[in-house]
From Swiss-Prot:
Belongs to the bacterial ribosomal protein bS20 family. Binds directly to 16S ribosomal RNA. GO terms for cellular component: cytosol; small ribosomal subunit. SUPFAM superfamilies: Ribosomal protein S20. The gene is rpsT. This is Small ribosomal subunit protein bS20. InterPro entries: Ribosomal_bS20 (IPR002583), Ribosomal_bS20_sf (IPR036510). One of its GO terms (molecular function) is small ribosomal subunit rRNA binding. It comes from the Bacteria.
Length: 85
């Protein structure tokens, strides 16, 4: 266990950051699952816009790598485009 005041503060800050990042990742994952489960193209398009923004935000905040976000967006776009109108 850390003894220095700054180290204790760093532990608290890291924990808070971890919880915030985990919450954002979990929320995004839930929306991705919801998008993959959708069968109506109009609904999927709306959800895709939202999920795309969420992935971009995660990449911007360095929670996930920008290429990871780009790959996920690409796969989701293919999925949405394959849906029957």
């Amino acid at each position: 266990m850390a003894n220095h005041k700054s180290a204790l503060k760093r532990i608290r800050a890291n924990r808070a950051k971890y919880l915030r990042n985990r919450y954002q990742m979990k929320t995004t994952r839930t929306f991705v699952k919801r998008l993959r489960a959708s069968t109506v193209k109009a609904d999927a398009n709306e959800l895709y816009k939202k999920v795309s923004g969420m992935l971009d935000k995660l990449a911007k905040r360095n929670i996930i790598h920008k290429n990871n976000a780009a790959n996920k967006k690409s796969k989701l776009a293919k999925f949405v485009n394959k849906l029957a109108a």
